[in-house]
Amino acid sequence: TDAYWQKLVSFCQVREDRRDQAALATDLLRDRGHRDPAYFALMDTLLGFDKAKISTLPSITPLQFAMLQAAKLPLPPDAAESAKPALLRAVAQSEGTDLAVRLTAAEQAVAANALDPAILGKLYLQGGTAWTAAARPGAEGVSAETAAERAALFRSARTATERVPRAAALKQLFDAAARNGVLRPVAEISMPLMRDLRPAAHLSFFAPQAVRAAVSADEPAVAAEWFRIALREAPGNPLAARGAAEVWPLMMLAAPDTAWSDQLFRTWWEQQLERDAARAAERAAAFLALLEALDTRVPAQAWSLLPPSTPQRGQAVPALRDLRTAAEKRRRGETLLRTAVATKANPDRTPESARLHAIVTALRTAGFGAQARSFAVDAAVGLGI
């Protein structure tokens, strides 16, 4: 907008020490009733007036970030909550910024593929020691809902010398990361710890989290090792049996050699009903649709367990017709472009199962087999399958 460019020019003017021009343009914006309290406060600071006190800025813009840096003011704690990927990357790499804010930004930036996971790993190792005695790894009530708490938990897992404490810490860490939508970034930097932690029967309590993390980090072989432990311990161990059923759908999607099991599907379906009955059918339909899109045969009785009104596989949706056409004609670039659009936008409110089926099928048809499977896994994790 015109106001944005005026603000940008004014900031450049004050940086070039043309303060009178910047002050005049800022006053004109105020007189026109433009609403941007953070900008005006920061501009006043840069012009040498009152020092800004900004305690919250959840929708920070690149201009506001640059102004905060120029004014040598700290970023508010919530600055990384809704920022764009490029800005998240900048915040994560801003050495003068509070570590807690950088950690939050780094997690989100890695999740958006805008930052090397190794940078997140280095940030996780900063900031002192780990949990206090009241919040030790594996303790009840450890939530790790902030990036700083997850970093501390990661350090506890890394420094644990025994396998059970390390598994307990990683279990807490992966659960917290999944709740906060950052499982893939956390899993990627935790894979070295996972490889050192060899699967064993006495660690079966950790198997579901290990499988989910390994699948998220595109490590199906590691996931398969932990899944086998859960299956092996399932007879006579209700916790292991429940864990095996919980992550079996992810193994079906991530590892093509995983066998279909009517019993595991039925148990998983019952778990979904217990967990969130309102979304159970949506998740189950999406799982089955993704399987079929990956050319895995789904028994008819599996669909019959779902309510008759559940949207099923591949139903014709006008909005996805162009995607299918591009894939069938092997227009690979167009297929990827239309896939990106279909992933982000759903103006026709297409049922999730049909949309995912169309996207994965199109990717496979256009010759992107590996990418189709990765997309299916990411979609399943995102849906909470």
Model-predicted regions and their roles:
Residues T1-I385:
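Alpha-helical solenoid repeat scaffolds
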